[in-house]
Amino acid sequence: MKRYQYVLPAILLLCNSVPPVLLAQDAAHYVVILSHDTNDVRLPMTLEAIRFWNNTSAELGLNLKVIEQVIIRSSVERQLENYARSISQRAGRLRPGPSEPDAPVEITDFESDVVLLLSRQDLMSFAWPLPRRPGHFIAIEEDRYTMTQNPNIARNIIAHEIGHTLGLPHNNDPTSLMCGPCQPLTAESDNRGFLPLTDSERNALREWYALL
């Protein structure tokens, strides 16, 4: 098994995840990916992370398929960057609730389960539940050194964020994908380059996404 240094940002999820409900009625989990550039190294990493979750779904026999749509140079990119910055700057000081402003219509208009922005800002990656409606907004930081020099770290961060949108919260197991917040550590990946899920997380996914 390959070993590497795995580092998670300080805030990966700014609130507790809520387990999905009635997902057996709709196995599709739609993710819209917005990138400014087709050459962004995070784009293939994001597709690999989605493939990881679909492979995990197949291995566990889940009624779940993550379906991606890639959009390059969207006309709403600036609005999404502004929203990402406003969330990141809070650093967890404000959790979604009655006082949380609605997400911009530029996000909700996509009508997807997840809008994932490959941000061009120096922010902390996060997965943010949309206030008063289903769905999540993910922003992935632009850290060119980490992304190019440590691709395993980058793809695990992206897979981690997508995991939150599937209902998985943080855990305190430093050898697992959903650990957070984690300090720098030496973790062991599988043969696909991803950290594993815990047994309890695998069982939770089987419960939430049980086949009919």
Where is each model-derived feature located?
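Fold-level signature of zinc-dependent metallopeptidase catalytic domains
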Residues: 25-55
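Bacterial N-terminal signal peptides
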Residues: 8-17
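Structural recognition of the beta-strand scaffold that forms the well-ordered cores
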Residues: 31-34, 114-118, 138-141, 165, ...
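Bacterial N-terminal signal peptides that target proteins for export
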Residues: 1-8
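Active-site recognition of the HExxH zinc-binding catalytic motif
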Residues: 156-170
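Sec/Tat signal peptide C-region and signal peptidase I cleavage site
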Residues: 18-23
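Metzincin-family zinc-dependent endopeptidase catalytic domain
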Residues: 43-159
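Metalloprotease/metallohydrolase-associated module, dominated by Zn2+-dependent proteases
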Residues: 134-153, 169-212
